UniProtKB/Swiss-Prot annotation:
Its EC number is 3.6.1.66. The active site is at D70. This is dITP/XTP pyrophosphatase. Pyrophosphatase that catalyzes the hydrolysis of nucleoside triphosphates to their monophosphate derivatives, with a high preference for the non-canonical purine nucleotides XTP (xanthosine triphosphate), dITP (deoxyinosine triphosphate) and ITP. Seems to function as a house-cleaning enzyme that removes non-canonical purine nucleotides from the nucleotide pool, thus preventing their incorporation into DNA/RNA and avoiding chromosomal lesions.
Length: 230
């Protein structure tokens, strides 16, 4: 079964393709479609609302079954922020924010290499903002969790199901690791010896991540849809 992944985020796409390995499913990215699909505005108040909207809209527009992800970081000390605004959190700064050397390098790469590097530059701005927001707080007040919702829709746009996954941890005091994307260099998941998500192997991350958790909850449904031809 061909399954459209309703996201242009290369990090999420890479993770999903690892997770579906072994299933009779070929994950298709929007970039592989014969015609470009319009952006779907993520204007929901919850991860579930956004994931379901994206799955239904992309499936209907493309005429094929679609899986959508909406996910982000919820920090206890920030009242659950950045939440659904995780990807674009730094865009909400009232003015130019002070940038770290890491952020400066990412901005230079974005200017030279284009959209994919630009996404990395935004990640670095988000991480800078997170560090500033928690400056001075001890570990016991830096609790956080990654949250993800996966939603599946049939080719006619009808929603089949949505499931949630969570990975609990805390926010570190400095970036560590080169893997993953987003807030991974700062997120220290529980039970991993103090390593950040970015210091884990791909297999280790998939075993404990919020997206992996959600996928395991929806895997049997995807297998059934594949048998039915969705």
């Amino acid at each position: 079964m061909d399954l459209l992944f309703a996201s242009t985020n290369p990090g999420k796409l890479k993770e999903l393709r690892r997770l579906v390995a072994g299933l009779p499913i070929r994950v298709v990215s929007p970039d592989e479609l014969p015609r470009a699909l319009p952006e779907v505005e993520e204007d929901g108040a919850t991860f579930q609302a956004n994931a379901e909207k994206k799955a239904s809209t992309y499936a209907r527009l493309a005429g094929m079954a679609a899986l959508a992800d909406d996910s982000g970081l919820a920090v206890d000390a920030l009242g659950g922020a950045p939440g659904v605004r995780s990807a674009r959190w730094s865009d909400e700064e009232p003015g130019p924010a002070p940038a770290s050397p890491v952020c400066d390098l990412a901005e230079a790469a974005a200017a030279e290499l284009g959209p994919v590097a630009g996404r990395g530059a935004r990640d670095e701005r988000n991480n800078d903002k997170l560090l500033r927001s928690l400056a001075g707080l001890p570990d016991e007040r830096r609790g956080a969790q990654y949250e993800a919702v996966l939603a599946v829709a049939r080719a006619d746009g009808s929603l089949v199901a949505s499931v949630a996954g969570v990975c609990r941890g805390r926010i570190g005091h400095a970036r560590r690791g080169t893997g993953g994307f987003g807030y991974d260099p700062l997120f220290v998941p529980d039970g991993q010896g103090g390593r950040t998500m970015a210091e884990l192997s791909a297999e280790e991350k998939d075993a404990i991540s919020h997206r992996g958790d959600a996928f395991r909850r929806i895997r049997s449904l995807l297998e059934r849809l594949a048998r039915e031809g969705a």
